[in-house]
């Protein structure tokens, strides 16, 4: 069962401005990644459902976060059907992120009052997801749509909260483009939690990178 309400999850996304996301098939390494991000100031994390036994690793992460990382909100991404969403909910997921909009996922998450974010790539998809209660839409693929898309939809849809995933990098200019366009937060994957960092187990570098990126985002949000 989720430890955090959908309101608490949304609030954390809005306040931090960044949702780190990753997948790794080893529980021990995944815990160290989560801890490094936590030590860097992150209080929300998306574990992507992209490999064999991902649910087992996720379950270990949730238990670890509850026991050792107070205030860390862990959710799941890359969910493509209601059955998978239900399995992760039972494992303690605090939110669900999908690459596409699906009514079955929306219904099961709403039934349990769990925060969910649907992957959308058009204003029609965004409007439909919001009709089903989606508070924050995942803009995907962000590298294809770009900040200009966000700025354009904010005209007719100023109430829409957006989290782009893909196409978001650590560079100041890139982050500035996204936040100037009106995003609520950004999803940050391999640009933040790189293969090199994982391979070399350079968790201190990950901590420092998370800390620096959060500070950059905070400064950009304050200037708006």
Residue ranges and their predicted role:
Residues 43, 95-105, 139-146, 182-203:
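Glycine-rich phosphate-binding active-site loops on the catalytic face of alpha/beta enzymes
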């Amino acid at each position: 069962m989720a430890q955090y309400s959908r309101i608490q999850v949304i609030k954390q996304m809005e306040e931090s401005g960044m949702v780190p996301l990753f997948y790794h098939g080893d529980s021990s390494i995944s815990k160290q990644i989560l801890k490094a991000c936590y030590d860097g100031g992150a209080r929300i994390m998306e574990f992507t459902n992209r490999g064999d036994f991902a649910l087992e690793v996720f379950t270990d992460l949730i238990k670890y976060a509850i026991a050792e990382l107070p205030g860390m909100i862990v959710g799941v991404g890359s969910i493509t059907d209601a059955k998978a969403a239900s399995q992760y909910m039972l494992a303690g997921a605090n939110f669900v992120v999908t690459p596409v909009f699906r009514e079955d996922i929306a219904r099961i998450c709403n039934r349990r009052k769990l925060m969910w974010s649907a992957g959308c790539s058009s204003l029609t998809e965004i409007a439909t997801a919001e009709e089903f209660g989606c508070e924050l839409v995942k803009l995907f693929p962000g590298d294809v749509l770009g900040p200009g898309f966000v700025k354009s939809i904010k005209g007719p849809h100023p109430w829409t909260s957006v989290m782009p995933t893909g196409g978001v990098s650590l560079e100041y200019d890139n982050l500035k483009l996204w936040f100037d366009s009106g995003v609520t937060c950004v999803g940050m994957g391999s640009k933040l939690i790189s293969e090199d960092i994982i391979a070399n187990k350079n968790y201190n570098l990950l901590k420092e990178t998370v800390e620096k990126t959060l500070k950059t985002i905070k400064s950009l949000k304050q200037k708006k």
